[in-house]
Amino acid sequence: MNVDIDTETGSSFSITIDFGETVLQIKEKIEKSQGIPVSKQILYLDGKALEDDLHKIDYMILFESLLLRISPDADPNQSNEQTEQSKQIDDKKQEFCGIQDSSESKKLTRVMARRVHNVYSSLPAYSLDELLGPKYSATVTVGGRTNQVVQTTEQASTSGTAKEVLRDSDSPVEKKIKTNPMKFTVHVKPYQEDTKMIQVEVNADDNVEELRKELVKMQERGELNLPHEAFHLVSSELPLIETKSFKWNRVADGDTIELIREK
């Protein structure tokens, strides 16, 4: 994803941010491009400093602007009292994200980053019928149980999209569905145009990479064709972090996961 960096002086530059990069890696790219040391950079989002070891997906940097503050050089001749006063002023500026205008703020260079291009903004759209009820589909279980493919021929009805309540087999009392069930079903849309949608049952706590492994096994069995090129698993136009769980990626029951070829 290409991002333009605009400064208060009117100059600008551009950097490319990849899907799985951490905040520290973004700072290193700025240092390599502009010569600004990583130790001088502080990235803010919604008034909070970003942690170097977290990924850009953690902060939804795909859709939000960043504020880059460059710390001024320290004065070796400054007294302890002056240092403490400067620290207090700096804390106030950090709290207000440098919005207030003061003489001290002129020592800082602020850089605003905004998203200008998303490689997935032009993804093909699918109809509601394609997503909810393909005529021929397969159900695969990913997790502790033996994987099994089941062919179904029923056409899903859009009127049946409401979630049902669970009933205890030994009791007529209804129980509400949990917010994050241990197992749930996702719909996988193959990269190649196909009339079938693959239904896969996954564990909420399993990493997304388990789904990729299962798709490779299905290809080996001749049940689907994966892209020849490297591809990403994408849900709601956001790439999934495969080393994290489905729950961490906020994948819910009934969500659609697409296979998008790497650009």
UniProtKB/Swiss-Prot annotation:
Magnesium found in the keyword field: no
Presence of the UniProt keyword Heme in the record: no
A Pfam short name: ubiquitin
Name this protein carries in UniProt: Ubiquitin domain-containing protein 7SL RNA2
A GO cellular-component term linked to this record: nucleus
Tissue: Expressed in seedlings, roots, stems, rosettes and flowers (at protein level).
This protein's UniProt keywords: Developmental protein, Flowering, Nucleus, Repeat
Biased composition regions of type Polar residues, renumbered to the chain: 76-86
Subcellular localization, as worded in the UniProt entry: Nucleus
Region (Disordered): 74-93
Any Gene Ontology biological process: vegetative to reproductive phase transition of meristem
Superkingdom, taxonomy of origin: Eukaryota
Family as reported in the entry's similarity comment: Belongs to the ubiquitin family.
Its job: Controls phase transition from the vegetative to the reproductive state. Involved in the maintenance of the shoot apical meristem (SAM) thus preventing inflorescence meristem (IM) formation and subsequent inflorescence stem development during flowering. Regulates leaf and organ morphology.
Note: Transcribed by RNA polymerase III (pol III).
InterPro entries (UniProt xref): Ubiquitin-like_dom (IPR000626), Ubiquitin-like_domsf (IPR029071)
Ubiquitin-like domain ranges (all copies): 1-53, 184-263
